[in-house]
Every structure is written in structure tokens, then in C-alpha cells.
Amino acid sequence: MKAMTKILTLLLAFLMVMTVISPLTACDKTPEQTPDTTACDTDPVTEAPTEQATETPTEGETRPETPPEPSVERVPDDRNLTAAQYSVLNIAGTDDFGRVISPVDGKVNDDRYVGMFYFLTLGQHTNHTGIYDINKITFDSTYHKAFTEFDTFITPVGSAHFWGEPVWGYYHSCDAWVMRKQIEMLTMAGVDFLVLDTSNNVLYENVTKILFDLLLEYQSQGWDVPKVVYYLGKHDLNADIGVFRRVHEIFYSREAYKSLWFTPNDPEKPMIVAPDNVIAAFAKSQNKQEKEFSSFYDFRVTQWPTEDVLHENGAPWIDFVYPQRSQDGWINLATAQHVTVNMTDIRGSRGRGWYPTKQRPNSGEWVGKNDHDNWRKDLNFQAQWDTVLNMTHEQRAADARFVFLTGWNEWVAEKLRAGDKDYFTCDTYCPEYSRDIEPSRSNGMKDYCYFMTIMNIHNDNFAPAVHYEYPAATPDITKDDTGVWATSKATYRDFTGECGDRNYKAMGGDTVYTDTTGRNDIDTVTVLRDSQYLYFRITCAEAITEHQAGDHGWMNLWLKTADAEGDLMGGYEFVVNYEVSGSKSQILRCKSLNDMQSVGEADVNVFGKAMIIRIPLEALGLSENHYQVEFKVTDNVQNMINDPLNLYSTGDAAPIGSLNFSFGY
């Protein structure tokens, strides 16, 4: 009996030990350390989720075994969506930090909106005469004294300085080639309105003319492009009234631009942000036009972060208090905040890596610190988003009806003198202390902030995706019979006209930017499936070019399954049309440029503007009931694996950049 008791005791001890250690052995690596927030009762900062390590396929294995059939209950897709709408809802992807953009089903509340601060300044001022990049001047922000203590031809006081290099180079605001890309990115992100920064009473009419015409062009093609709001500043009253009159004349009075008005409260009343004294002057004016302004416009009030008064119906473009305050449903989310007014003050300002650590008991305001190691994750911006995401849906409808993001493309600030020797900038400084969402080539920033913005817009403003039915259909791949393709709900659109030739001057200096890599301008992608194959019908704006021997960048189809694991190349498991022979293409399982293995053949047929590709499900590890993939189509993108930012700047990519389309969710 004693022996039996001893055995049972040992077994019980063994089971207790296994219970303790098993969570530690459930994955091959421990989660990444998050910032220390032990001083807080709760941690309001959302860190990028970390991927658990997965088992790498054994040597010589071309494809993991087909997973067991998932149990997914699907429903008919009765939504009446255009291809453009379907595309925006089915954006997907995963960034280097493991953050995920998931497809969505539609807006939770059609009366909530996301706005973006949009700037028009580059190349428009007399001090925009050269290219001065603070990140390069300070050797990737490692020697700040090179900027703050010197006034030389390398970094002259009084000149506008870039905080870093934009993905399209140091571009001029009138470069329509760049502007087309911007409109595409903002539309695909789900941004509802642009707020034009004219707060210094400069209207940049040569820039806005290009912007408005391009917005109208894409709107006429069926894209739900962002609408437009002007943001006017407070200076001399008479001068401010004159600026208001001019804005009315060049934009709001023109019938051609009426479809670009942002009208959230009344379809006949465009929103405009104006100083409180200008609005009051119109209400009291005896001037006929000014009296009409009072009833014509939906006014919001210009709100500066340093003002003592929070205006009724205010529209803050930044908030120095955390959590941010709502002003009659308008709340600002900024990537960084220059709370000491001097963004060069890297101790006092809140950079991209700032996160809240402790809440003051009396005011409820949070204090925090800058994480100089993890600023590329935009911890600050995520904390700003969390202010909204932590609200209930009812609170969001009341306090976050207008989520206003600062900002998209500011890029420059004037170098100013502080005393005899010190120099500074006000609004933006270096990559860590900058507030642009537009992708950058500086200091490893890439497009992380843009990616995170889409993720949060999806989480905030949209309902989770639904498992819809994708009825089986088998097209004849030997001809372009559009009949069967028309039965598919899964038709995705790409912007066209945005991959033409580029030839425009930089913001300053003698540099001229040129690009002629645009070749096949991708228009639509329609996907079908049956019990054995996936089918893709890709159309371009013009006839698809013939494949040339040795061209690995011709009409590539990149694929990632829902069960992707192990090493991926640029985030993708498979590529089609990397190796083409006649009407056949190898389906390459790709781990790196030096490790590509064929897992089968795809059929590829071209019919003028259309290409039809047939891929065996089995080659991708998929099956009749398990066919979820993310995909991207690219043409002539240069060196995309080593430099994925080239997906924004060379050839054509559908969808743009590091985004994918989702099929079969």
C-alpha cells in the first residue's frame, strides 16, 4: 500500500510539473518584451502582436501537407457592391511586426468618418530652394548637434528641412504622378475626407487645382475618393475674411466641385473649419454674401492646442493632452506631439515611441515616456487610436464621430534660430519626431504607419468580415468568355493611370524625378474556384505586353494561403509568372530569391487586355472547401523583394504597396 501511495505521489508530482512547464514550451520563442507599464493599473498601449514560431518544412519538402478541412458555415453574399467597394473591403496583409489587416464587411455606422490632414506646401515657398534632410544631416539621428548647433550650407537657417525622405523622393506638391498614388492609398485605406492645411492663409491654388481634378477623375470612375474640407487659420480678421471669400470663390461656389464637398450633416451644406471671430462676423454682417455664408456652410471652429478655451464645435488638428479630448464629436489622433512647441526638444516632445505610463489622479491625464527602441511601431499613434477603440460604440457615435488624423504629408519645417547658437524646428524634426503617415525610406520606417492606420480604421469603423459563399464555377480558359466570370462577386479593382511615366522636378534644387517602369496598367482581377482549381482573370487598361525571355517581373501573381508557415519571400508563399514558357508557368514555392521550388504548373493565356490563369488547388495545399488566399498582381516592379517600398514607386501593383486582396475568407 505504501509503495502504491509513493507511486501515486510521484505521478501527481510529475503531472504538476508538466502543468507548470507546458505553457513555456508551447512555442519556440518567447513574446517580444513590451514597454514597462507597471506603474499603470491598465496598459492603454497596444503592442504589435508577436508571431509564434512555426515548424520549418524539412529539407526538400515543397509544400506542407494539406490541412484538415475547416468547419466554416457560409452564407450567400447579397450585398450590392461595386468592384471598387468590394476591393476596399477586402484589403488584407501582415506587416513585419505581425500586425494584421483583416477584410471587413462594411461600415458599422455610416454616420462616423475618418479624416486626414493633407498638406500642399512642398515647393510653394521661397525657402523651398534646396533639399536638406535632417535624418541625413544627423547621420540617421545619431548626432543631433549637427543640426542644432550649426548654420552651414549643408543645413542653412531659414530654409525648409525634410525630416526624412518620402517614398517618392523629395517631391514637389504639384507632381501629379505622386498625387495619383496618394489618392489611391487614401481611398484604399478608407479615409472619408481630407482636411487641407491652409491655416497660414496661403491657399496653394496651383496645387489644389491638380488635386481636385484628379479626385474628380477617380470619382467618375466609381471610386469613393475622400471629400474635401478647408482648414483656415486665425490671423487678422479682415485678412481672414478675405481668405475665406477666396476659398468660397475657387472651390465651394463651383458646381463642378460640389461632389467633393464633405457634407455629413446636410447634403447641401459643405463643412469648413474657420476661426470663431470670422464665423461671428458673418452672423452679424450686413453684407449680403457674408450673411449667406452663415446659412450656406456647416462650420467647425479652428482649434489650436495652445488655446486656453476649447471652442464649441471646435476642430482640433492636434491635442497636447492624453487621452485626447472630444469636441462635439471631433477628436484628433496624431502620430507625435510637439508639446513644448519645439519638436527638436526630443526630451520634452512626444515622439512616435511615446506611450502612457501613469495617470494623474486629479486630472485624469496620462504622463508617459519615449521608447527610443520601438518608435517605428508608432506606439504613440496606437495609444491615440486606443482612446477611440476603448470607447463603446455608443460613445464613439457621440464623441468620435469625426476621427481626424494628423497627418499625411507635411514633411518639412523651417530651421529657426533660438538664441545665438541653437537652432530648432517647430512642427516636425527627424523620423522619430515626425508626424507623417505617408511611407518613408528613412531609418527603417517603411510603410508601417500607413499599414497600422488601415488596421485601426478597419477595427474602428467597420464590421468584421463574414464567411460568404463563393459558388463553384469553371470558366473555359482557352477563350475570354466574360459570361461565367460575371457570375463572380469576387472582382477587385486597381486604380488606373497611376503608373504612367513620371517627369517632374523635386521640391527644391535641380533634381528632376523620372520613372518609365510603368508598363501593364492593371485594372481588375476576378477570381473563381471549383473543386480542383483557382482561376484568375486579370485585365489591364491596354493590351498586355508579350512576355520576354528572362523577364521575371512580367504580370506576377503572388499568393499567400491562410495556413502560410515557415519562411516567406516578401510575405508570399508562391509566385506565378516568375518563370514562363509559352502558355505554362511554374508555380514556385518561394522562401527567398535563392530558394524557389516548383510545386506544379499553372496555365496562362493572354487575350488582348485580359490574362487568364488556372492554378491547381492541390499545388497550393488547398482544396475544394479550403481555398482562402491573399494575393497581389504586379508588373515590372523593380527589386521588390529586397526593397518592398518599390511596390509604391515602380511598375504597377494591385493593390498598391504591401497590401493584398483577400479571397475565400
Predicted ranges, named:
Residues 32-71:
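N-terminal, intrinsically disordered, polar/charged segments of Gram-positive cell-envelope systems
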Residues 117, 197, 229, 526-528, ...:
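Residues within well-ordered beta-strands of beta-sheet-rich folds
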Residues 69-474, 552, 598, 624, ...:
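Glycan-processing catalytic domains of CAZymes
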Residues 18-37:
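Sec-dependent signal peptide cleavage junction
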Residues 475-584, 636-645:
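Surface-exposed, glycine/proline- and aromatic-rich loop segments on solvent-exposed faces
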Residues 5-17, 25:
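Sec-dependent N-terminal signal peptides
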Residues 607-653:
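Ser/Thr/Pro-rich, low-complexity mucin-like regions
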Residues 523-526, 599-604:
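Beta-strand-rich interaction surfaces with strong enrichment in secreted/lumenal proteins
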